[in-house]
Amino acid sequence: RAIRQKLSRFPVYKKEQPLWIHDQHINDRGVGVDLNLAEHAVEIDAVIKARLLEQAKELTGLENPKSTAQLKGWIEDTAGIEVESLNKKSIAGVRADADCDAVDRMLDIRAGLAKTSTEKYNAMLRTACPDGRIRGLTQFYGAARTGRWAGRLVQMQNLPQNKMPDRDLDTARQLVEAGDLETLEMLFDDISGTLSQLIRTAFIPRPGYRFIVSDFSAIEARVIAWLASEEWRMEVFKTHGKIYEASAEQMFHLPKGSVKKGDPMRQKGKIAELALGYGGSVGALKSMGALEMGLEESELKPLVNSWRAANPAITKLWWDTDAAARRTIQTKAPTKLPFG
């Protein structure tokens, strides 16, 4: 009663209440999972990991080859190099410096041991109800800053992609369901990767039904273009929709249609679109992997400047929104912007 009284000062918007009720119905109904597939996937992964660990011990002679400190020492002794780090960004450099087949093989094994192919399968087994359905997979207003739906338990909003053909996927699924590791290894090279691709197939509809999955295409780029009324971008989305190519052409004053897939300029357009649409700068480019993509440090700031110059309406929107937020805080009164 006391909680209700406190919350009464903050009434739920009329349009939000039906959404919340709908969310509750979805969570109460739950989603079916193939527990047989999940169980066998976990078992197969355990066998693969045990094999890799034995191979690592045999190759290195280490008691615990999963220990970063022990492995760094082994690489230094084997290849005669100094190893500062074995994090993801450093591995390519370590391989190049070592130039050693044994080190390459051990780093491959280490990558295999670190794969988390079955974490979501384990989560399914932990959270499934007796009827084989998982409930509570989404949380209404779960994200702290944005208020969007948040994934819970198995985190369905972040599932590995299926990259193999449907026929191969079906074959792999049948073999995993049967626990047939021997045939699986005959047909597929990367067992851990195959298990990852099968995660989506572990969610199953009721008999006679199908799951229809859809996603928004370049949703962040579309929304910011619409909010800011960046005309050239909206024209791109009205027509061919190739925003990476169009962005590169706009930024570097290239003829329309001149940038194609595989063009280095498209790569610059892509990283700029991914990192810079919402006020990001050099730090955002680095976080999105610009340096790993082959861009030089000296290219980053000019890339930021080029993108902002090509998108003046979006850049103006940022500063207008910033000024409105400051004004609202200072005056304690709402500030209306063109989009709301």
Residue ranges and their predicted role:
Residues R1-L195, R210, S217-E220, E249, ...:
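Conserved "right-hand" nucleotidyltransferase catalytic core of DNA-directed polymerases
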Residues K6-V12, E231-F237, L254-V259:
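Short, polar/flexible loop-turn hinges at active-site or ligand-entry regions and domain interfaces
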Residues E16-L19, D263-K270:
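Short, leucine-enriched amphipathic alpha-helices that occur as contiguous helical runs
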Residues I191-L198, A202, K261-M265:
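Active-site-proximal segment of RNA-dependent polymerases
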Residues T239, I243-P264:
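Generic long, charged, amphipathic alpha-helical segments
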